[in-house]
């Protein structure tokens, strides 16, 4: 039997999603340990998209296979009670055997939140990035539109990125201000390592006036990571979740 889970987590205390063995706690390892405890047998999960250390997840989707019979609500509640308080399973649904959390997804969504004021955050320091320079969100939004469509995003991926190629389709990019907080929301078919944070880092330079609006298009065309902006800090980034065709009968928040 195959199940899909919707998982929410605060990534502050984790080295990232992926379980790499030694080196500190991961979200994946914590989830697999809790699921295995409920099943009383080892279980492994496959996720829709891995996140880095300090990055959060609002509705990460995973799937797992098991012969153990449990009600979906029992999987959800039983697993959550065994997880650290920074991770929760929001829902559990049975899915077809050919559903795949990663390969069945048609899009993925991220949001980056940035506090734009002179004084750094205290209460939300783990869920907000910070920029003391005044930023023009309209300039950032206009500049970001140059990235829409299918492009080679080599200028916006990390040097450690192991993807075979840098072509991705960015379906939407919106920059908006809500009081002192600027939000950058993106949706694409897939993302490269550090791609969202590198885009945000470059947009900040445009928003501050240090770089012209046209600079983002020049970076995209030049495909040179070394001349782009710095990688924005991880704490401002949330993986909102993937999107799937409606034939998989998943909750509305992850359905196209």
Swiss-Prot record:
Top-level taxonomic group: Bacteria
Membrane-spanning intervals of the chain: none
Gene3D superfamilies: Pseudouridine synthase I, catalytic domain, C-terminal subdomain, Pseudouridine synthase I, catalytic domain, N-terminal subdomain
BP GO annotations: tRNA pseudouridine synthesis
Catalytic activity: uridine(38/39/40) in tRNA = pseudouridine(38/39/40) in tRNA
Active site feature: 52
Complex and partners: Homodimer.
Protein's job: Formation of pseudouridine at positions 38, 39 and 40 in the anticodon stem and loop of transfer RNAs.
Protein name per Swiss-Prot or TrEMBL: tRNA pseudouridine synthase A
């Amino acid at each position: 039997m195959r199940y899909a889970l919707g998982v929410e987590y605060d990534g502050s205390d984790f080295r990232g999603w992926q379980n790499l063995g030694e080196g500190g706690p991961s979200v994946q390892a914590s989830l697999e340990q809790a699921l295995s405890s409920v099943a009383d047998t080892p279980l492994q999960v496959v996720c829709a998209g891995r996140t880095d250390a300090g990055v959060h997840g609002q509705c990460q989707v995973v799937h797992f296979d098991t012969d153990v019979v449990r009600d979906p609500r029992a999987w959800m509640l039983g697993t959550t009670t065994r997880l650290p308080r920074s991770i929760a399973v929001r829902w559990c649904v049975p899915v077809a055997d050919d559903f795949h959390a990663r390969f069945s997804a048609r899009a993925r969504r991220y949001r980056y939140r940035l506090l734009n004021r002179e004084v750094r955050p205290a209460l939300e320091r783990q869920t907000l990035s910070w920029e003391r320079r005044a930023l023009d969100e309209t300039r950032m939004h206009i500049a970001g539109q140059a990235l829409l469509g299918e492009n080679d995003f080599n200028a916006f991926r990390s040097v450690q990125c192991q993807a075979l190629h840098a072509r991705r389709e960015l379906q939407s990019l919106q920059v908006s201000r809500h009081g002192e907080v600027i939000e950058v929301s993106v949706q694409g078919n897939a993302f490269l390592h550090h791609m969202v944070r590198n885009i945000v880092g470059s947009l900040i330079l445009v928003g501050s006036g240090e770089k012209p609006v046209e600079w983002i298009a020049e970076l995209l065309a030049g495909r040179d990571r070394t001349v782009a902006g710095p990688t924005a800090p991880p704490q401002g980034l949330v993986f909102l979740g993937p999107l799937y065709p409606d034939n998989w009968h998943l909750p509305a928040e992850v359905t196209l």
